[in-house]
Structure formats: structure tokens, C-alpha cells
Amino acid sequence: MGVADAPSPGNVPVLGDMKNRSAAEMKISVLALRALTLVLLVIALALMVSNKQTQSIPIKLPGMASTIFLKKTATFSQITGVQYYVGALSVAVAYMFFQMLAGLFTILTTGSIVGSKSRAWVTFILDQLIAYLMVSAATVVAEVGYIARRGETKVGWNQVCSDFKHYCFIYGFSLVNAFLATIAFLPVVAVSAFHLFRMYGAQSAQSK
């Protein structure tokens, strides 16, 4: 190796500093994305649970000249799909809060964001499950919302958003936050997978 190819004395510290800085930035980014996901999930859940509207619906019965009005109240508990959405988001909120606390504790005690290999496996599997849960919940509610807005004439379902405009608006706002939470969480899922398989890559390199 010639003189020109020899590493300068400052190369190793500089590369080490860059690696440490990159690892620190990744830790902060993952925690920030988990926090953002948690906030969006809480907003989506709070909007759906608190969403309620009572409206007088005009009904004209056959053989009656006058129109009667029935009071109806729209809430999340009336539709099974929306109940699933509320339950799924509740689980996701609890998980995200726990993972944030566990992540902070792991960073403060070990300096790593994943800790041991077993912890990395648990995080990887649970992140995958929660991501699927969030996607399925948002998809179900999106389909229910579409039918509520457009109706389904083939099975005789009328659209109801013309009568419950405020409820449908809040419903849609909750759904938007749920999809944004899912988008924010996807990079976290990718990072947890990256950390797990990097552990096995490092172990394989050491054994050679």
C-alpha cells in the first residue's frame, strides 16, 4: 500500500463520529415517528368516539298525507365496522404508548433502540401486527363511510350523509387521521425489521 493509500490519522474518528451521529438520528427519528403516530391515533379515536348527531328524519308512510318525523342519533356504537375501528385504534394507542416508554428506557439504559435480540423480535412481530390492524380498521371504516355517503342501491341501502352532515364530516376527519397515522407508522415497521436483520448480519460477519 502506498503513502497515498494510507488512511489519515483523522479518518477513523471522523467515520466513527458520523456513524454515531447517524445512529443517534435514527433513534430520534423512530421515537418521533412513534410519537406522531400516537398523536394521530389519539385524535382519530377521540373524534370517532365523541362523534354524535341527533337529527329528525322525515318519513312518509303509504296512505298518509302528512309526513312524520323520527328522531335518530348517529354514534359509532351503531355499526359493527366502526366498533371494530374504535377497538383496533384503542389497541394501537396502548401499544404505541407502551413502545415509546420502552424505547426511551432502552435508549437510556443500553444506548440502543431495540435492546436484545429477543426484544428486537418481539418489536418486529408486534409492529407488523399493529400495522395490519391499523390498515384493516381504516379500510373497513372507509368502506362503511363510502356506503353512508353514496348508498348501495343494489341492496336497498340509502345514503345517510345528507341527513347527518356533521357526523359524516367528523367521521371523515377521523378516518384521514387514521390513514395519516398508518403512513407515519410504516417507516417505523421498516426500521424495526432493519434492526432485527442487521443483528443477524453482524453475528454472521463475526462468525466468519
UniProtKB/Swiss-Prot annotation:
Show which residues sit on the Extracellular side of the membrane. 49-87, 142-168
Q: What is its main location?
A: membrane
Give a Gene Ontology cellular component term annotated to this protein: plasma membrane
Q: List where the protein spans the membrane.
A: 28-48, 88-108, 121-141, 169-189
List the membrane topology term(s).
Answer: Multi-pass membrane protein
Q: Give the Cytoplasmic membrane side ranges.
A: 1-27, 109-120, 190-208
> Domain of life, per the record?
Eukaryota
User: What InterPro entries does this protein's entry cite?
Assistant: CASP/CASPL (IPR006459), CASP_dom (IPR006702)
Compartment list: Cell membrane
Give the keywords, sorted. Cell membrane, Membrane, Transmembrane, Transmembrane helix
Q: Subunit comment for this entry? A: Homodimer and heterodimers.
Sequence similarity: Belongs to the Casparian strip membrane proteins (CASP) family.
List the NCBIfam families.
A_tha_TIGR01569
Protein's name according to its UniProt entry: CASP-like protein 2U9
UniProt lineage = Eukaryota, Viridiplantae, Streptophyta, Embryophyta, Tracheophyta
